[in-house]
Amino acid sequence: MLSNIIPLSIGAALGATARWLLNLAVPAAMSPATGNLFANWTGALLIGIFAETVNHPQWKLLLITGFLGSLTTLSGFSLETVTLLQSNRPASALSNIFLHTAGSLLLTWLGLKIGTAVK
């Protein structure tokens, strides 16, 4: 059990830190939602790559469940979308939904292709 908790915890700490740093790196002129979009897109690409290239169970826990689970954020995406709707900005909310969903699906597919190519 502990042999699973340690890599999971390390990955989660690194993923949460990466998301925080990514949000800090987003220029003030851009929407705060941009950091979460970049985090989700990065996570989508990486999960495709890792799904094809990482075989060891502890590495999967560290990279996929821990790191990517903390880097990506469905709850942040949900809050941003609901906030846009509550601010009477339905077009922005729909755009947010489309960018997160379509972009993540496309990047996961691309990541799987990259992972297969480097495997």
Curated annotation (Swiss-Prot):
Give the transmembrane ranges.
37-54, 61-83, 93-112
Q: Name one GO cellular component term.
A: plasma membrane
Q: What is any one GO biological process for this UniProt entry?
A: cellular detoxification of fluoride
One GO MF term attached to the UniProt entry? fluoride channel activity
Summarizing activity control, the record says: Na(+) is not transported, but it plays an essential structural role and its presence is essential for fluoride channel function.
Q: Identify the domain of life.
A: Bacteria
Any idea where this protein resides? Cell inner membrane
Is Transferase one of the keywords? no
Q: Which UniProt keywords apply?
A: Cell inner membrane, Cell membrane, Ion channel, Ion transport, Membrane, Metal-binding, Sodium, Transmembrane, Transmembrane helix, Transport
Q: Where, by residue number, does Na(+) bind?
A: 69, 72
Q: What is its main location?
A: membrane
Q: Which reaction does it catalyse?
A: fluoride(in) = fluoride(out)
Membrane topology, record value: Multi-pass membrane protein
Entry's family note: Belongs to the fluoride channel Fluc/FEX (TC 1.A.43) family.
Cross-referenced PANTHER family: FLUORIDE EXPORT PROTEIN 1-RELATED
Q: What does this protein do?
A: Fluoride-specific ion channel. Important for reducing fluoride concentration in the cell, thus reducing its toxicity.
What name is this protein filed under?
Fluoride-specific ion channel FluC
Q: Which gene encodes it?
A: fluC
